[in-house]
């Protein structure tokens, strides 16, 4: 008779499997995650280097053995999540994984793949929770610097007399971001439903996702050493590296930044477990991952304003549309478009 859902996978065992690997368990994630992003949990793992990159929410970068993410295979429950075209990875698509992780495992070294990512640098496998056999729940609320807020609610029915088991988790993160004008909002959800079918069969449906939106500091707005020193006068004693060249306010006082991203990429899996006899079982899994989203940034319509949306050029701050306090003059852009007889000059 089936008692619980058992998830099986090809997982290395520390000190036994003859490969260079490291594990991060659930307890370590709970103790150290805080308001960090999930890749940063691997910073203490040998051969792994993670950084917030541009500083905006979900824009983390992960390197393994010196190789970029396009040469590092990342999987969630054994399913590859790297981009099929260029091999990169957008961690903002998986912003809520920190609350759903059961364990993470890194395997350093060469791997082979016919599709997606040739894992020259190594492999990262993130395994999420399944249905919880214990009845109960919890709620947490955390705060951090730069207006960071994190709310999580989780509940599980445990195994009912009728053979059902429900586990659910909902969460939300929001804040202003460390970099100017990189405010973000992230909703997280996870569910797992299982049902016993007689003495020998059990099915389970699991799904999770993190619809998120966040503003970014444009990758083309990097400043030189002299450029960073130039913006020091705008920061009021704060770190110059928090400066965002395209951060500013519209005519109605609304906060703006030229780069914005929204995406939602949920993953669902349907598992069937058949206990054939005392020594044999058959596990079948079907998974689906879909996604939709968009990103936008400013664009000049004609050559006169082709580069005006960029806050910097050649490592130096641009002053085409710039207020005396260093903020980008979105109000001036709006006025320029309103006064034009031939349509908007900058969109």
What does each of the following model-derived ranges do?
Residues 42, 103-105, 124-126, 284:
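Non-catalytic regulatory/gating segments with a bias toward low-complexity or hydrophobic composition
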Residues 3-33, 61:
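N-terminal periplasmic "start-of-domain" segments of outer-membrane beta-barrel proteins
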Residues 61, 80-108, 127-129:
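Short acidic/polar hinge/loop motifs at secondary-structure boundaries
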Residues 39-80, 102:
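Extracytoplasmic beta-strand/coil segments of soluble accessory domains associated
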Residues 194, 202-271, 296-346:
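Acidic/polar loop-and-plug regions of large Gram-negative outer-membrane beta-barrel proteins
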């Amino acid at each position: 008779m089936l008692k619980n859902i058992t998830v099986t996978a090809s997982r290395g065992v520390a000190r036994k499997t003859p490969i260079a690997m490291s594990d991060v368990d659930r307890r370590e994630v709970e103790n150290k995650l805080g308001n960090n992003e999930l890749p940063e949990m691997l910073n203490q793992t040998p051969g792994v280097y993670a950084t917030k990159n541009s500083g905006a929410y979900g824009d983390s970068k992960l390197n393994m053995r010196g190789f970029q993410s396009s040469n590092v295979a990342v999987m969630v429950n054994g399913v590859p999540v790297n981009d099929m075209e260029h091999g990169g990875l957008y961690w903002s698509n998986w912003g809520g994984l920190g609350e759903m992780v059961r364990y993470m495992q890194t395997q350093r070294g060469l791997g082979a793949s016919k599709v997606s990512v040739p894992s020259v640098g190594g492999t990262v496998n993130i395994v999420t929770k399944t249905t919880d056999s214990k009845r109960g729940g919890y709620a947490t609320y955390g705060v951090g610097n730069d207006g960071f807020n994190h709310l999580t609610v989780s509940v599980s029915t445990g195994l009912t007399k009728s053979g059902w088991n429900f586990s659910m988790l909902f969460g939300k993160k929001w804040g202003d971001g460390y970099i100017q004008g990189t405010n973000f909002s992230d909703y997280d959800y996870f569910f797992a439903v299982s049902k016993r079918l007689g003495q020998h069969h059990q099915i389970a449906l699991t799904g999770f996702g993190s619809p998120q939106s966040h503003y970014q500091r444009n990758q083309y707005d990097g400043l030189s050493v002299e450029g960073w020193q130039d913006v020091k006068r705008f920061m009021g004693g704060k770190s110059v590296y928090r400066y965002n060249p395209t951060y500013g306010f519209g005519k109605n006082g609304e906060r703006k930044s030229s780069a914005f991203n929204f995406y939602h990429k949920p993953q669902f899996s349907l598992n069937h477990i058949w206990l054939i006899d005392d020594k044999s079982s058959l596990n079948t899994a079907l998974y689906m991952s879909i996604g939709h989203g968009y990103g936008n940034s400013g664009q000049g319509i004609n050559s006169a304003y082709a580069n005006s949306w960029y806050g910097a050029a050649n490592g130096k701050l641009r002053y085409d549309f710039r207020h005396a306090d260093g903020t980008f003059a979105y109000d001036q852009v709006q006025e320029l478009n309103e006064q034009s007889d031939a349509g908007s000059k900058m969109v």
